[in-house]
């Protein structure tokens, strides 16, 4: 079998969802049924394979994306399939966090994966982080299948969950399984492709399951959903469509072919159900992974930039192409040091070879290559297109970098990282901890690009910035556990931003004469607001040599640096454009540095007069509460400047959706616990930046002046 043909039996998938929807439990069952694990780990016992960090086992949540490889031989009683030789599929799985503070782990995993299992809580349905993960998958056009989990739980409602997928995710769910029973009577599923019931044994940890005829009380419903299934899927294949409208019977293989085609193209999303904790539905989920999610061969050619020509090119995902890969994660392993996870897009990679990091123009030697199973590892000598492996000892490579062969150098599309929304001041408990803190943060930031740390040049105070309170709490924990560094931690602070609301043109001259060589630079810059999310843009419209082109990078550099300290309260300035339209220079006294200084002073003057405003992060908050506490909870959200968007009943509880400034949400978990006697719960995700009220802006400016 050729290497490229083997690729058709590889699946690179992620498992993602809202916290507590059952992602890690589902993954643990997959590892058990595929023979990777000989016992089933449980989140509540702290014995899971995929959650291997101490903080993960202590808290019962997934923090880092753990990678593992398993193999699956599909069990099939379909005559067309059974006559063929059984084929083993290689499945590379990345289990991602569901907590909003670790969204970056989800994003960078999706960037290198070909497909995703979206796990939904059968009781809660589509939750806020489910939406966030879904939008990230949309961004990278990752094909998905859905698994409605926890069908054994009180309040589980498969059909409500499917409707929520339509309403909240804007997707087209394709139901390919129906639950048999509900809550404590749930015992299996109806397979709408085979038109058979599948029932799991309560013994052998669900390893055995049998096919039965469809229960008589479900015939009408099954026929209805089967009709909907066929009407949807035949649209993707003209030949099969013609057979269908001619009333010819469609084979299972035909139906699967159509589902696969539609799922990979994103026309619809197959929906399955089960209970991972009760060991029901996982084997059929694995079958769906190999049937309906793409192999590397199904992925379109990758886009890249040729280093020599700087032109955009495409490269086939093939073993026959030159080697290229993207580094999507770096971790520090206590036994082997730095581990760099890569997804190989083309060609082959052998240990002992030399490659080039084209992002940084640095050569790297591949001394050791590992297949990872959570924190266990297996040495390998060669990896090929489609593989996800870990490399040890890379000196220059960090997350988002491209590595490729020396003979054909390209740069792949980078991974985008979210900006921090919260910060903490940290200081060493003892002078001896000062250097250790810096060293620890350098290593942690290399692993996690959403972690940023800075040192105030005036106070020498160190500030760490991240995606939420839990994110920074975990960082402090890891500094203590892994690096033996004790730190005093300040109260959390919001990472505000600044922007402008109107255009303003500045004509600024920087002139300095101190005997000897002087400094001279004149710049004329238009500062204008941009739409939300546009960031910073610089454009030069200099013509006729008013400013020599070698000095223009100095203007851009000056603006890039100064925009990080805005004029309102010292926060980064975003969503504006600076257009250099004129200027002048001196033959002797002008320099790149002089134009850098001129640009910085022009920024201070121009932004001050362009209607500067302070922006704060707004969070989308979902609160689930028993009816009797609704009044107090809504009153509290209103007192936090919250805007209630909707309220919807769910059994004897209510779901409140609101937008609330992050600065008003610190310590909310304690307040909510007190208001509801511990019975309500909440989750929140970052939504957008919004102008803060005048009173809050004045408070922040007053703090800044102290």
UniProtKB/Swiss-Prot annotation:
Source organism superkingdom: Bacteria
Residue span(s) of domain tr-type G: 8-297
Keywords: Cytoplasm, Elongation factor, GTP-binding, Nucleotide-binding, Protein biosynthesis
GO biological process: ribosome disassembly
Protein name: Elongation factor G
InterPro entries in the cross-refs: EF-G-like_DII (IPR053905), EFG_II (IPR041095), EFG_III (IPR009022), EFG_III/V (IPR035647), EFG_IV (IPR047872), EFG_V (IPR035649), EFG_V-like (IPR000640), G_TR_CS (IPR031157)
Molecular-function annotations in GO: GTP binding; GTPase activity; translation elongation factor activity
GO annotation, cellular component aspect: cytoplasm
Binding site for GTP: 17-24, 95-99, 149-152
Main location, first listed in the record: cytoplasm
Cytoplasm listed as a keyword: yes
Function description: Catalyzes the GTP-dependent ribosomal translocation step during translation elongation. During this step, the ribosome changes from the pre-translocational (PRE) to the post-translocational (POST) state as the newly formed A-site-bound peptidyl-tRNA and P-site-bound deacylated tRNA move to the P and E sites, respectively. Catalyzes the coordinated movement of the two tRNA molecules, the mRNA and conformational changes in the ribosome.
Family the UniProt entry places it in: Belongs to the TRAFAC class translation factor GTPase superfamily. Classic translation factor GTPase family. EF-G/EF-2 subfamily.
SUPFAM superfamilies assigned: EF-G C-terminal domain-like, P-loop containing nucleoside triphosphate hydrolases, Ribosomal protein S5 domain 2-like, Translation proteins
Species of provenance: Orientia tsutsugamushi (strain Boryong)
Pfam families xref list: EF-G_D2 (PF22042), EFG_C (PF00679), EFG_III (PF14492), EFG_IV (PF03764), GTP_EFTU (PF00009)
Locations listed in the record: Cytoplasm
PANTHER family (UniProt xref): RIBOSOME-RELEASING FACTOR 2, MITOCHONDRIAL, TRANSLATION ELONGATION FACTOR G-RELATED
């Amino acid at each position: 079998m050729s290497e490229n043909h083997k690729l058709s039996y590889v699946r690179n998938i992620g498992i993602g969802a809202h916290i507590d929807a059952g992602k890690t439990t589902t993954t643990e069952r997959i590892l058990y049924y595929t023979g990777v694990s000989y016992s089933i780990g449980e989140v509540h016992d702290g014995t899971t394979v995929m959650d291997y960090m101490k903080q993960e086992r202590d808290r019962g949540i997934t923090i880092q994306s753990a990678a593992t490889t398993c193999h699956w031989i599909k069990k099939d009683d379909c005559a067309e399939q059974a006559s063929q030789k059984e084929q083993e599929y290689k499945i590379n799985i990345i289990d991602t966090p569901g907590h909003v503070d670790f969204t970056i782990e989800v994003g960078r995993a999706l960037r290198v994966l070909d497909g995703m299992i979206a796990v939904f809580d059968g009781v809660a349905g589509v939750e806020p982080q489910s939406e966030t993960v879904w939008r990230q998958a949309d961004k990278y056009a990752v094909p998905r299948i859905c698994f409605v989990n926890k069908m054994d739980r009180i309040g589980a409602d498969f059909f409500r969950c499917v409707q929520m997928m339509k309403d909240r995710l804007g997707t087209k769910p394709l139901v390919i399984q129906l639950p048999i029973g509900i809550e404590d009577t749930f015992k299996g599923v109806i397979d709408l492709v085979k038109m058979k019931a599948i029932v799991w044994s309560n013994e052998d940890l669900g390893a055995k399951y049998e096919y039965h005829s469809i229960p008589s009380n479900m015939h009408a419903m099954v026929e209805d959903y089967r009709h909907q299934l066929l009407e949807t899927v035949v649209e993707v294949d003209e030949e099969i469509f013609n057979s269908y409208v001619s009333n010819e019977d469609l084979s299972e293989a035909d139906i699967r072919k159509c589902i696969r085609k539609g799922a990979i193209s994103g026309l619809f999303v197959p929906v399955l159900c089960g209970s991972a904790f009760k060991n029901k539905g996982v084997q059929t989920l694995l079958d769906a992974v190999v049937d309906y999610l793409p192999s590397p061969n199904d992925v379109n050619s990758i886009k890249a930039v040729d280093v020599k020509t700087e032109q955009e090119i495409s490269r086939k995902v093939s073993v026959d192409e030159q080697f290229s890969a993207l580094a999507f994660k770096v971790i520090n392993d206590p036994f082997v040091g730095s581990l760099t996870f890569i997804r190989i897009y083309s060609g082959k990679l052998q240990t002992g070879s030399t490659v080039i990091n084209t992002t940084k123009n640095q050569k790297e030697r591949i001394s050791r290559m590992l297949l990872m199973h959570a924190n266990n590892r297996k040495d390998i000598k060669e990896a090929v297109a489609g593989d996800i492996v870990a490399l040890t000892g890379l000196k220059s490579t960090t997350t988002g970098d491209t590595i490729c062969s020396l003979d054909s150098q390209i740069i792949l599309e980078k991974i985008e990282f979210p900006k921090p929304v919260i910060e903490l001041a940290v200081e060493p408990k003892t002078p001896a901890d000062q250097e250790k803190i810096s060293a620890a943060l350098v290593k942690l930031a290399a692993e996690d690009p959403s972690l940023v740390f800075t040192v105030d040049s005036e106070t020498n105070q160190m500030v760490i910035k991240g995606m939420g309170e839990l994110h920074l709490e975990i960082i402090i924990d890891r500094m203590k556990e892994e690096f033996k560094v004790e730190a005093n931690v300040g109260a959390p602070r919001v990472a505000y931003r600044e922007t402008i609301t109107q255009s303003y043109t500045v004509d600024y001259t920087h002139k300095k004469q101190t005997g000897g060589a002087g400094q001279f630079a004149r710049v004329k810059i238009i500062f204008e607001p941009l739409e939300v999310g546009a960031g910073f843009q610089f454009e030069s419209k200099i013509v006729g040599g008013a400013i020599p082109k070698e000095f223009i990078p100095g203007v851009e550099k000056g603006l890039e640096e100064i925009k990080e300290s805005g004029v309102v309260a010292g926060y980064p300035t975003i969503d504006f454009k600076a257009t250099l339209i004129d200027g002048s220079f001196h033959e002797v006294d002008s320099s790149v540095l002089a134009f850098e200084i001129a640009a910085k002073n022009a920024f201070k003057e121009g932004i001050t007069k362009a209607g500067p405003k302070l922006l704060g992060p707004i969070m989308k908050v979902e609160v689930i509460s028993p009816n009797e506490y609704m009044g107090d909870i809504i009153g509290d959200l209103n007192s936090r400047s919250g805007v209630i968007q909707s309220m919807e009943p769910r059994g004897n509880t209510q779901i409140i959706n609101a937008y609330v400034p992050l600065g008003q949400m610190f310590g909310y978990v304690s307040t909510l616990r007190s208001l509801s006697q511990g019975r309500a719960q909440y989750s929140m995700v970052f939504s957008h930046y919004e102008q803060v009220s005048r009173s809050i802006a004045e408070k922040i400016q007053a703090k800044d002046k102290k």
